[in-house]
Amino acid sequence: MEVENRPNTYDFSKRDKLLSNRFYEENSLQDETDDGGERWCLICGDRASGLHYGIISCEGCKGFFKRSICNKRIYRCNRDKNCQMSRKQRNRCQYCRLQKCLQMGMNRKAIREDGMPGGRNKMIGPVHISLEEIERLMSGQEFKEGSDLSDSWSHGYSNHSSPGNSLSEGGQSLSFSSSRSVSCRDECISPQLTHTFLMCKYPLPPPTGSILKTQTHTLTGQILADEDLTPLTTPMLIEDGYSVTQSELLALLCGIADELLFRQIVWLKRLPFFTDLSIKDCTRLLGSSWHQLILLSSITVHSAQILGELANVTHHYTPSSHTLQRFGEDAMEVMESLNFLFRKFHQLNISNEEYSCLKTITLLNQETTGLCNTSMLKQLSERYWTLCRELTERLHPQRPKRFSDIITCLTEIRHTSGKMMSIPLEQLPLLFKAVLYSCTTNQNPWLPKSSTSRT
């Protein structure tokens, strides 16, 4: 596409001036304050919220460091591994951000082993680690050795509560990060979903109840038959040379969302357990999960159309300078999350059967108040979790961690879709243009670089 000849079509670094906040010196670990008594993050210069993992830092860098270590993420720098860190630039290079965290003394041993909020030991201070150890962490070598050790425990707990967001397949690494705070993620991941997610690493108890006795292959066939896997009918074709306006692209995005939502309603009514649930329960479940279902559909069965036809339409949209300036940090984080999800699901290559199971799991695992038949919903939830795991193990016996990778993606979908709901409508055209441009060109930082890298 023509867009590939414009390497910096979206140079977000130009939309903000550099911060004027006073940064700490690279080797200073003291709790310094300015005349007003405020403290600044050692990593990015944002206002610090306290002592986190041994050093003074902000909530964003605290959460980023925790996710990077707990999820064993591996990043790449497209430049010289010396990118500037500031509050508004910290999201642009996760490699340099994590490297700065380690250089400034953030202590990974202060992270709780269960991965939950709260330091493991408030008295643990900053640490100094060698350049060799930093390189081992940044390259993922230390994570790999730790993973090999934990794999030798047949049923033992690993050092982290959730599978990593780094996926290695065919010698290529995929990673994800954003600067959202831990508290934001805690709000988006319900206790019910977190509990079930943790349970998925270990054998679930066998399902009970007459409604759960359907054979696995029969049940899989039933929910697959309920799916409408045909291409989207919303027109996404455009003539060459036509300039798409912001309102036109927004109308198209709304049209696609409307069609996907309608398909979810039809799908729900076809599910084998639909008649066993009250209309009230079905309405509440769909009302709390529709945005997750739409996102899941977009990045799996409809990804070819989204990355093809829709990406071509967004290519003909040119945002104004005003729109670029108003593209906030929340939108940047969503963009990063969507990039990750598109890439990871592409590598996972989810089958239609797995997709059907994941949709059902997403529908049933909602922390919704006012449900009538909670006991049946719990049984159904356990049944479809087990079904999905059995299906994944049968289709991919050589990849025992595949199910955990998939469930990690569901958690990310839950968070990202919720975050998208807070993005102003007028920012959505630019958001999708940036995401689809990144996913369809080698601008994506997770794509392997063959010879040269763009800056």
From Swiss-Prot:
Spans of biased composition, class Polar residues? 149-165
| Zn finger intervals (NR C4-type) | 41-61, 77-96
User: Does this entry carry the keyword Disulfide bond?
Assistant: no
Q: Does the keyword Hydrolase apply?
A: no
| Domain NR LBD per the UniProt entry, residue ranges | 215-446
Query: InterPro entries this protein is in?
Result: NHR-like_dom_sf (IPR035500), Nucl_hrmn_rcpt_lig-bd (IPR000536), Nuclear_hormone_rcpt_NR3 (IPR050200), Nuclear_hrmn_rcpt (IPR001723), Znf_hrmn_rcpt (IPR001628), Znf_NHR/GATA (IPR013088)
From what superkingdom does this record's organism come?
Answer: Eukaryota
Keywords in alphabetical order: DNA-binding, Metal-binding, Nucleus, Receptor, Transcription, Transcription regulation, Zinc, Zinc-finger
Q: What are the start and end residues of every segment in region (Disordered)?
A: 145-173
Report any Pfam family annotated for this entry. Hormone_recep
- Compartments, record wording: Nucleus
Q: Name one GO biological process term.
A: anterior/posterior pattern specification
**Which Gene Ontology cellular component terms are annotated?**
chromatin; cytoplasm; nucleus
User: Which residue ranges does the Swiss-Prot or TrEMBL entry mark as DNA-binding?
Assistant: 38-113
Matches recorded under PANTHER family: KNIRPS-RELATED PROTEIN-RELATED
Membership in a protein family: Belongs to the nuclear hormone receptor family. NR6 subfamily.
How this chain assembles, per its entry, is: Homodimer.
- According to UniProt, the name of this protein is Nuclear receptor subfamily 6 group A member 1-B
Q: Which gene encodes it?
A: nr6a1b
